[in-house]
Amino acid sequence: MSRIDFGAKPLLFPMPVLIIGTYDENGVPNTMNAAWGMISDFKEISISLSEHKTTANLAVTGEFTVSIATEDTVVACDYVGIVSANDEPDKFAKAGFHATKSDKVNAPLIDELPMALECRVKSFEDDILIGEIVNVNADESVLTDGKIDPKKLKPIAYDPANNTYVTIGDVVGKAFSDGLQLK
């Protein structure tokens, strides 16, 4: 195998496509696309964010949702990452999204995105948002035997090497199980 150097680049696979939902000071829903995020503890999510309308909203409400972008919503999810609510105040509706107020946090659940984390801001320093996960909810349509089923959810990931969105593949093994055969 021959390796090629690419230098220091943000190439990590897969990068989940996270759609952050907030309300502004007037209760108007806003959303943005963020790919640089991850679970950082059992009840914690960390997301790298520069200054946006969303970050201004977070300073006001301190609460947000993180929905998982899906194969069926690529165009809308990409749109909310391209357009700023500072320039297009109605971008939430223009994306075709509809909001239902979360009963756990002061933030919108996006009806078109079937899975969401409901979060409170723990800290936001040096462009790193750390949120406490208060609840995870999912539409029944993406469940199998009471669990979230990735095949039904159809989450997408961001491919930073090619600037594309890709689907998540098939099950190839059982976590915390298959490796036991080497013990």
Where is each model-derived feature located?
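Basic, polyanion-binding surface patches
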Residues: 1-183
